[in-house]
């Protein structure tokens, strides 16, 4: 079995200009976006997120290159230098020109309800990223077999992973087997992200012809995987002196980051919860 490693961007936004391998490649398997047999994307709601960056970097720690070796120490010691042409990142969702999804839920006449209130209470609330901090970090084993691949992993949604791999690897569903191992916590953090780490392990496994294991340490898991969304929530609530509510207007803005992932699903759940 080989150990796998993901080489990631060190800038939040820019263009990759050069990748240099500073190690003896003997015994190594190296893969980049050109080794993807299917579509270089993580298939989910939209096909906007690459499995491996081709040229553009859109967030810090974006996957660029994959390495595998039988000796884990040699794997971790392998030096890779990447040159970039940096660009200005956008960190504030209120400044972003791009909207992944807008959901409107209307019931009754909100404007009239607020006008008929004795008092309108307004508030703005900001929440930051939340790390799920599951006990077991993300990890998978990919085994090439029978003209396809079997993946064993710590994950929540095996059918998400299977669909993503059929698109990435250009394989029929019956050639992609995903086994959900006993999972040491997820809390949403292993809902869609395992499609990424599974894709990386599979690319290395298919190129090397050997099983490949990738297990993140805590630092990599925290900096590279998706989190609970930061957001800005604004409430306007109309109330009367007798305590009755006349109307509530709620605006929720989520920071979905560089790619859509499952942000519309999260937004829809927040909307239903407030209603």
Residues of each region from the PLM?
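Flexible, low-hydrophobicity surface segments
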Residues: 1-100, 120-123, 207, 262
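Glycine-rich phosphate/pyrophosphate-binding loops
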Residues: 26-39, 171-179, 211-215
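Glycine-rich and small/hydrophobic secondary-structure elements
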Residues: 46-75, 188-241
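Gly/Pro-rich active-site capping loops and adjacent beta-alpha segments
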Residues: 74-90, 160-161, 166, 171, ...
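Conserved beta-alpha junction segments in alpha/beta enzyme cores
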Residues: 110, 114-169, 254-256, 263-268
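Proline/glycine-anchored alpha-helix kink/cap motifs
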Residues: 140-144, 163-177, 200-214, 241
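Beta-strand segments within the central parallel beta-sheet cores of soluble alpha/beta enzyme folds
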Residues: 151, 175-181, 209-219, 246-252
């Amino acid at each position: 079995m080989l150990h796998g490693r993901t080489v990631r961007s060190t800038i939040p936004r820019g263009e990759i200009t050069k990748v240099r391998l500073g190690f003896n490649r003997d015994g190594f398997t190296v893969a980049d976006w050109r080794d993807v047999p299917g579509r270089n994307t993580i298939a989910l709601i939209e096909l906007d997120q690459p499995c491996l960056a081709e040229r553009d970097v859109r967030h810090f720690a974006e996957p660029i290159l994959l390495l595998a070796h039988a000796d884990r120490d040699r794997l971790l010691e392998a030096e890779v230098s990447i040159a970039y042409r940096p660009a200005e990142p956008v960190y504030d969702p209120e400044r972003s020109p791009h909207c992944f999804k807008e959901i409107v839920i209307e019931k009754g006449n909100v404007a009239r309800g607020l006008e008929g209130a004795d008092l309108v209470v307004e508030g703005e609330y900001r929440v930051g990223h939340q790390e799920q901090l599951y006990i077991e970090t993300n990890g998978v084993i990919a085994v090439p077999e029978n003209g396809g691949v079997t993946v064993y992993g710590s994950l929540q949604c095996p059918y998400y992973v299977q669909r993503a791999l059929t698109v990435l690897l250009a394989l029929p569903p019956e050639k992609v087997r995903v086994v959900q191992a006993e999972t040491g916590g997820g809390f949403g953090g292993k809902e869609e992200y395992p499609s990424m780490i599974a894709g990386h392990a599979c690319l290395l496994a298919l190129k090397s012809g050997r099983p490949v294991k990738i297990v993140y340490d805590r630092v990599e898991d925290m900096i590279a995987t998706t989190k609970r969304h930061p957001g800005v929530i604004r409430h306007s609530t109309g109330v009367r002196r007798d305590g009755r509510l006349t109307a509530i207007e709620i605006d929720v803005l989520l920071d979905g980051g560089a790619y859509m992932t499952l942000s519309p699903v999260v937004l829809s759940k927040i909307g239903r919860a407030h209603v």
